[in-house]
């Protein structure tokens, strides 16, 4: 008798994706982040669903409803902090996942990579709208500042901003629609993640050497299912340590003050995972220029397949490119630090230098280093 796992129309899809999937035998722990992102998404959807049962998206009661969740709902504090810190874990895994893709040349799978960049944008939009929902000071002013950036678009800017707001300022209409979008987007993310996997399984996984590994593949289960489970346990350990010991470590104290349109906080800044983009935005004195730089700082990822000049796929055997890659990582840390600092000397200058370096490495230095390596390695 044939195995139902291999014949049933639905179960066989799962089988080909997670059980009998041919996987390169040499993929390292850097390949764990895809499954960790799946775990983060499940945690966020489940905790978010329970929060939505108690939350009210009204300017008068939103802040109080979050307080009610933390004080009166059974384990509400746990659900709330898991959801808030779950976003941070999500972005840590996302950045490491993208970094792995850049280092090992995974971007040569065009479709998988481009869907991944769209996923990154969608997750960022979802996180931004989620940050507005508790209706604290930083929620309100963050929403005001970031949505206001759209007014830099010539001709239609102001109309567009008022259309998004649903009025002449961030108010009840804005909060309600942000809640609606924040609720629905994770399900769209889940659908996009399935498309991401679909395209990945068309080509098969990349591996650290960047070479074709068809001759050396092993089944996903039990080898990599066990490896992924270890990753899950490590992630849960770090995540729950953060949630149970220092739940407010990555948050902003200003968000414990209810939103007040008449009182601006001294330093308006987004959550830590947006600070690098915020620093790039602030480093350009022109409003439209800043908005374009902000957009391009993420969209630039889509150019990587075009800018790949090396005759080798991975950076594993390319020391010059490796060096530039780690300078880029250090530069992103610098930008993240600058994004959280006040707009004054010397932070403005450091931010501008770091922003120029960010775009220079990606657009000029990496392609040039790749061509040089081709010459040096006699390709």
Curated annotation (Swiss-Prot):
It is found in: Mitochondrion inner membrane. A ubiquinone binds at residue 201. The keyword Nucleotidyltransferase does not apply. This is Cytochrome b. PROSITE patterns: CYTB_CTER, CYTB_NTER. Belongs to the cytochrome b family. Keywords: Electron transport, Heme, Iron, Membrane, Metal-binding, Mitochondrion, Mitochondrion inner membrane, Respiratory chain, Transmembrane, Transmembrane helix, Transport, Ubiquinone. It comes from Glaucomys sabrinus. The keyword Hydrolase does not apply. Heme b b562 binds at residues 83, 182. It is a multi-pass membrane protein. GO terms for cellular component: mitochondrial inner membrane; respiratory chain complex III. It holds the Pfam family Cytochrom_B_C. GO terms for molecular function: metal ion binding; ubiquinol-cytochrome-c reductase activity. Heme b b566 binds at residues 97, 196. The cytochrome bc1 complex contains 11 subunits: 3 respiratory subunits (MT-CYB, CYC1 and UQCRFS1), 2 core proteins (UQCRC1 and UQCRC2) and 6 low-molecular weight proteins (UQCRH/QCR6, UQCRB/QCR7, UQCRQ/QCR8, UQCR10/QCR9, UQCR11/QCR10 and a cleavage product of UQCRFS1). This cytochrome bc1 complex then forms a dimer. It comes from the Eukaryota. The chain crosses the membrane at residues 33-53, 77-98, 113-133, 178-198, 226-246, 288-308, 320-340, 347-367. Its cofactor is heme b. Heme 1 (or BL or b562) is low-potential and absorbs at about 562 nm, and heme 2 (or BH or b566) is high-potential and absorbs at about 566 nm. Binds 2 heme b groups non-covalently. Component of the ubiquinol-cytochrome c reductase complex (complex III or cytochrome b-c1 complex) that is part of the mitochondrial respiratory chain. The b-c1 complex mediates electron transfer from ubiquinol to cytochrome c. Contributes to the generation of a proton gradient across the mitochondrial membrane that is then used for ATP synthesis. GO terms for biological process: mitochondrial electron transport, ubiquinol to cytochrome c.
């Amino acid at each position: 008798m044939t195995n139902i796992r291999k014949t049933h129309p639905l179960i066989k899809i799962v089988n080909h994706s997670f059980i009998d999937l041919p996987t390169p035998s040499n993929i390292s722990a850097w390949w764990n982040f895809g499954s960790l992102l799946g775990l983060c998404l499940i945690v966020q959807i489940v905790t978010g669903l329970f929060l939505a049962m108690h939350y009210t998206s009204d300017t008068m009661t939103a802040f109080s409803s979050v307080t009610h969740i933390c004080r009166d709902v059974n384990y509400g504090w746990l659900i709330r902090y898991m959801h808030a810190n779950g976003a941070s874990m999500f972005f840590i895994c996302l950045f490491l996942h993208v970094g792995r893709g850049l280092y090992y040349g995974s971007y040569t799978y065009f479709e998988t990579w481009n869907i991944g960049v769209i996923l990154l944008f969608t997750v960022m939009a979802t996180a931004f709208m989620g940050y507005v929902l508790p209706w604290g000071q930083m929620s309100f002013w963050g929403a005001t500042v970031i949505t206001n950036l759209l007014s830099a678009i010539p001709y239609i800017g102001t109309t567009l901003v008022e259309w998004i707001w649903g009025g002449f300022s961030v108010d009840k209409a804005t909060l309600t629609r942000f809640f609606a979008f924040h609720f629905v987007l994770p399900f769209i993310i889940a659908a996009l993640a399935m498309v991401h996997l679909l395209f990945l399984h068309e080509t098969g996984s990349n591996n650290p050497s960047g070479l074709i590994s068809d001759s050396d593949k092993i089944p996903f289960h039990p080898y990599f299912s066990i490896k992924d489970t270890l990753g899950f346990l490590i992630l849960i350990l770090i995540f729950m340590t953060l949630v149970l010991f220092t739940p407010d470590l990555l948050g902003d104290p200003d968000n414990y003050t209810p939103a007040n349109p008449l009182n601006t906080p001294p330093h308006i800044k987004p959550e830590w995972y947006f600070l690098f983009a915020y620093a790039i935005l602030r480093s350009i004195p022109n409003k439209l220029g800043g908005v374009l730089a902000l957009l391009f700082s993420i969209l630039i990822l889509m150019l990587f397949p075009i800018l790949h000049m090396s005759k080798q796929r991975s950076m594993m055997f390319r020391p010059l490119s490796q060096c530039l890659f780690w300078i880029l990582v250090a530069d992103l840390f610098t930008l993240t630090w600058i994004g959280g600092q006040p707009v004054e000397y010397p932070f403005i200058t450091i931010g501008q230098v770091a922003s120029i370096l960010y775009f220079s490495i990606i657009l000029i230095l990496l392609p040039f280093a790749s061509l040089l390596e081709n010459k040096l390695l006699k390709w």
